A protein has these predicted regions:
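Short beta-strand
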Residues: 123-127, 161-164
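Substrate-recognition "cap/lid" segment bordering the active-site pocket of phosphatases
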Residues: 82-111, 163-193
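Histidine/lysine/aspartate-rich catalytic loop segments that bind and position anionic ligands
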Residues: 150-169
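Mg2+-dependent phosphoryl-transfer enzymes with acidic/Ser/Thr/Gly-rich catalytic loops
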Residues: 2-5, 15, 41, 174, ...
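Short amphipathic alpha-helices in soluble, non-transmembrane regions
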Residues: 109-113, 145-155
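Asp-based phosphoryl-transfer active-site loop
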Residues: 11-33, 61, 182
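Active-site phosphate-binding/coordination module
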Residues: 39-126
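A generic structural motif
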Residues: 130-136, 168-172
C-alpha cells in the first residue's frame, strides 16, 4: 500500500486494449454539495462514447449512484455500469435487473434520517432505493451527529454495512462493493482477458483498485488521499478529462 500518492506516477496513455473502469463523482465530475446538481459536459459524454467504441465496449462506469441516475447524467449513452457500489450491475445495452423493494425498517430509517437532517441546514439525505446516504459537505458540523445516527441505524438492518466516503456515510447491503462489480465484469466479454484499469478517488474505490492490481492491472487514484493501493495518480477531475482526451 502506498502512503504518498503525490509521488505516484501518472498513468500511461490510454490503450484500446484495456478494460477501463471509471468512478463518477470526484473522478469524471467534481463533487457538489447536492449530488443531484452535478453536470457531465457534452465533451466528456462524446469522448466516452468514442472510447467505448474503440475498446469494443470494454468501458464501464463504477459508481455509488444508482444506474438509472447514471443513465440520466450520461444520456444518451447507456454504458456498462455498476451502481450502488456494486449492488446494481448492467452490461451495455441490456436491461437492469430490478432489486427487491426496500424493507419497512429501511424506509423508517430514511424517514428518521430526513427528520434529523432537517435540523442541520445543508445536511442531505440521499435516497438510493436499497441504500441511503447521509451527506454533510455543505454542513461539516453535522458530521458527528449523522455518523452516530448511521452507526446505530445499521444495527437495525440485517445484512447492511456502513460505507464511509468523502463527507458522506452510506448504509448499504453488504457482500458487494466496487471490487466485486469489477471482478464480475472481468469474467465476461468484452472485458475478459484485457488489461484492467480503474480510475477513482474515494475510499470506496480501494476495493476496485485492489481487484485490478491483483489481476496485474492498474489502479489510478484521483487526488491525494492516503493510503492507497493504486500505483498511479491524477491530481484532479480536470486531469482525468485531459488524460481521457476530453479536456478543454
Amino acid at each position: 500500500m502506498t502512503d504518498g500518492p503525490t509521488f505516484l506516477p501518472p498513468p500511461p496513455p490510454l490503450s484500446d486494449r484495456w478494460a477501463l473502469f471509471l468512478d463518477v463523482d470526484g473522478t469524471l465530475v467534481p463533487f457538489a454539495d447536492d449530488p443531484a446538481q452535478v453536470y457531465v459536459s457534452p465533451r466528456v459524454i462524446s469522448r466516452l462514447a468514442s472510447l467505448a467504441t474503440a475498446m469494443d465496449g470494454a468501458l464501464a462506469l463504477i459508481s455509488g449512484r444508482q444506474v438509472e441516475v447514471l443513465d440520466r447524467l450520461f444520456a444518451p449513452l447507456r454504458l456498462a455500469s455498476a451502481g450502488l457500489h456494486g449492488l446494481q450491475r448492467r452490461r451495455a445495452g441490456e436491461p437492469l435487473a430490478v432489486p427487491p423493494p426496500p424493507t419497512g425498517t429501511l424506509q423508517q430509517v430514511k424517514q428518521e434520517a430526513l427528520a434529523l437532517a432537517a435540523g442541520w441546514p445543508g445536511a442531505l439525505v440521499e435516497d438510493k432505493g436499497e441504500a441511503v446516504a447521509l451527506h454533510w459537505r455543505a454542513m461539516p458540523e453535522a458530521a458527528p451527529v449523522l455518523q452516530a445516527f448511521a452507526a446505530v441505524a445499521v444495527t437495525r438492518l440485517p445484512g447492511y454495512q456502513l460505507q464511509p466516503g468523502d463527507m458522506v456515510v452510506e448504509l448499504r447491503p453488504g457482500q458487494v462493493d466496487k471490487g466485486t462489480a469489477i471482478e464480475a465484469f472481468l469474467g465476461e466479454a468484452p472485458f475478459h482477458g484485457r488489461f484492467p484499469v480503474f480510475v477513482g478517488d474515494d475510499l470506496t474505490d480501494e476495493h476496485g483498485f485492489r481487484v485490478v492490481e491483483e489481476r496485474g492491472g492498474l489502479g489510478v487514484l484521483v487526488g491525494d488521499r492516503t493510503p492507497t493501493v493504486a500505483r498511479a495518480r491524477l491530481p484532479d477531475v480536470a486531469a482525468v478529462h485531459a488524460w481521457l482526451g476530453a479536456g478543454d
